[in-house]
Regions:
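Nucleotide/phosphate-binding sheet-loop regions of phosphoryl- and nucleotidyl-transfer enzymes
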Residues: 1-166
Length: 166
């Protein structure tokens, strides 16, 4: 009912991305994770339209002559991180937050505020969900789905999410 916007990789910043690269011995993965975080946080928390980020990725791929995001290397993600942070600054007039606690508070606030979004109101009306109920925030550690070709993530429901049947 709050529409379940997701922000992955919260806590990454210019400093922690280096630690993640060192810990995993995979700079490309770390930089890709950081740019994903900037994109999700920029969209969900800061209100930057997603197409601004997607357009940049597509332009990078065109310039390199590749089709897939997985064909971009660590240097490409470095460039995109800088460009993504510039988009955030241009659209919000603020620097992308480097303080992990401010990132967390921003994400939590965005989830609570999503309850009053037009999309959530329409969904609640269509599904007869009372507006007095409110929404919850889940903060959890997760595995990475973008660490390599043998990594993935998924969602499992124990009940039908549409009607609640077993």
């Amino acid at each position: 009912p709050g529409m379940m916007d997701t922000i992955l990789n919260l806590g990454l910043n210019d400093k922690t991305v280096k630690a993640l690269a060192n810990k995993t011995s995979n700079g490309r993965f770390a930089k890709d994770s950081y740019r994903r975080f900037i994109q999700m946080y920029g969209n969900v928390v800061l209100g930057v339209e997603n197409y601004h980020f997607e357009e940049l990725i597509e332009n990078y791929k065109l310039t390199k002559g590749v089709l897939l995001d997985t064909d971009l290397d660590e240097d490409d993600w470095d460039g995109l991180i800088k460009d993504f942070k510039n988009i955030v600054k241009e659209k919000t007039k603020k620097e992308f937050p480097q303080d992990v606690y401010k990132q967390l508070l921003g994400a939590i606030s965005a989830v609570f505020l999503s309850w009053d979004s037009n999309r959530a109101k329409i969904y609640r009306k269509l599904n007869q969900i009372p507006s007095e109920w409110g929404t919850a925030v889940n903060v959890q550690s997760m595995v990475f789905g973008n660490m390599g070709n043998n990594c993935a993530t998924g969602v499992v429901f124990t009940r039908n999410p549409s009607d609640g049947s077993n």
